[in-house]
From Swiss-Prot:
One of its GO terms (molecular function) is metalloaminopeptidase activity. Mn(2+) 2 binds at D265, D276, E439. This is Probable Xaa-Pro aminopeptidase PEPP. Belongs to the peptidase M24B family. Its EC number is 3.4.11.9. Its cofactor is Mn(2+). It comes from Uncinocarpus reesii (strain UAMH 1704). Keywords: Aminopeptidase, Hydrolase, Manganese, Metal-binding, Metalloprotease, Protease.
Length: 481
């Protein structure tokens, strides 16, 4: 782990700085630069027909302005006074005997970058207090619709604005500060260890679920207690399903005994910040000729896209380049036929690369602010989660892929207009590959990028790691004790 990251993360999460940025964003959106920002954290919620609570996940916008991962909490930012107040649950004697004492206000003030910490029972009183001085009271409170509990009252304010706060926070979240980038880098460092553990164990694994268990346990060992999303461990044809998550198929082919490639798309989360990394692994220790050919195309797609990444570049153009590289590679293999320009204009490559090249990343894996247009009539751009130009300190994924999904490709084969562009006889050799995707996480800079992802992706290096063949899992039986 990078000591420079440790040094940055030794400080507090910059909630006060974020609050000021959001206030500036509100002003830029036409607000008068006055008022109170109000946000609520996630409430404790019980599972249906159970006395267990639903697993807790903090609201991202609340965390952005508080850095607080406690349930049933609140935060206010008085723009006029530049005062950030955190409200946390007081001790409940009935709960203390089960879960221990909660964090005190004094402890919270040392942990969180806020000016004041108060019990959550004082929220309404403090909102009223903001308006006590009629000469200097904030006239407006900013809140997010459907994110305010019925017990909260904004009656002391002249106006409640429900329209601009969420968008202002999302605009600020697009551009990461040094602390956030350090969190994302640490999440990547941990996930790199987990990916390597899966690579090393993959040659002896018997089932996809074993590899998921290794990934999750390695993340937990390094203090990543949540996954950014459900891990994808897709052997062979399962890799053609973009978000396959069954993760329970035996590795060896039941007929031939062959061990195909594995598409692993998995990332641990660190202190609310995500990672999103994808690799393809030869489970036998060596890629099949067909899998290696597709792997080389996808890696070429990614590397050529890397050459475009910098501030001011239109993401649509980077995505289009990925398709052009894919077309060239598939033509060279004989899967596609025709001129490369005609294939691009007809969108034939969408049959093999149906998703967008990447997305913003931060507290959410598919982070906010990407401005997608899922109604775009052009199928090549319909599923792009990011539209527009890149800016410094935005964090994006670059994740090209080539897939052999019958559900997606067969309509092209049946199309009177498009079937002529695909050689089905050549294609038949590649169905078993399933899919190959290679994904890294990049910080955009003025002149290029910083790659946060360190998982090996050179094909020969990946094969060498897999060939080490360490045991996937050593289970201890009760009979061995």
């Amino acid at each position: 782990m990078d000591p420079a990251v440790d040094k940055i993360l030794a400080g507090k999460y910059p909630a006060k700085q974020h609050a000021r940025r959001v206030a500036e964003a509100l002003k830029a959106a036409g607000q008068d630069g006055s008022g109170v920002i109000y946000l609520e954290g996630t409430k404790t919620r019980m599972a249906e027909d159970s006395d267990e609570a639903v697993p807790f996940r903090q609201r991202r916008n609340f965390y952005y302005l508080s850095g607080c991962d406690l349930s049933d909490s609140y935060v206010t930012y008085n723009i006029d006074k530049d005062e950030l107040v955190l409200y946390i649950p007081p001790a409940d004697p009935d709960e203390v005997i089960w879960t221990g004492l909660p964090m005190s206000a004094e402890e919270a003030l040392k942990v969180y970058d806020v000016d004041v910490v108060l019990p959550s029972t004082e929220v309404n009183a403090q909102l009223a207090h903001c308006c006590a001085n009629k000469d200097s009271k904030p006239k407006r409170v900013y809140a997010i619709p459907d994110r305010v509990c019925p017990e909260t009252t904004f009656l002391p304010f002249d106006d409640t604005n429900w329209d601009v706060l969420a968008q202002a926070i999302e605009q600020c979240r697009k551009v990461k500060d040094e602390y956030e980038i350090a969190l994302l880098k640490r999440a990547n460092e941990i996930s790199a260890q987990a990916h390597l553990a899966v690579m090393k164990a993959s040659k002896t694994a018997k089932n996809e679920r074993e590899l998921e268990a290794i990934f999750r346990s390695t993340c937990l060992y390094y203090d990543s207690r949540q996954q950014s999303y459900g891990p994808i461990m897709a052997r062979g044809v399962n890799g053609a399903t973009l978000h396959y998550q069954t993760n329970n198929m035996d590795i060896d082919d039941p007929v031939t005994g062959e061990r195909p490639s594995l598409l692993i798309d998995a990332g641990g989360e660190y202190r609310m910040y995500a990672s999103d990394i994808t690799r393809a692994i030869p489970l036998s220790g060596k890629f099949s000729p067909e899998a290696r050919q597709i792997y080389d195309i996808v890696l070429d797609m990614q590397m050529q896209c890397f050459g475009m990444i910098k501030a001011g570049v239109a993401w649509d153009d980077v995505h289009a380049l990925a398709h052009k590289v894919a077309i060239k590679g598939l033509v060279n293999l004989g899967i596609l036929r025709g001129s490369e320009e005609e294939l691009f204009q007809k969108g034939v490559s969408v049959a093999f690369f149906p998703h967008g090249l990447g997305h913003y990343m931060g507290m959410d894996t598919h982070d906010v602010g990407g401005n997608p247009n899922f109604a775009d009539p052009n199928p090549m751009f319909k599923y792009l989660r990011l539209r527009g130009t890149l800016s410094p300190n935005e964090v994006v994924t670059v994740e090209p892929g080539v897939y052999f999904c019958r559900f997606i490709i067969e309509p092209y084969l049946k199309s009177p207009e498009l079937s002529k562009y695909i050689d089905s006889a050549v294609l038949d050799k590649y169905w078993k590959v399933g899919g190959v995707r290679i994904e890294d996480n990049l910080v955009v800079t003025q002149d290029g990028f910083q790659n946060l992802t360190t998982v090996p992706k050179d094909a020969e290096e990946v094969e060498r790691i897999v060939q080490q063949g360490v045991p996937a899992f050593v289970l201890v039986s009760i009979n061995d004790i």
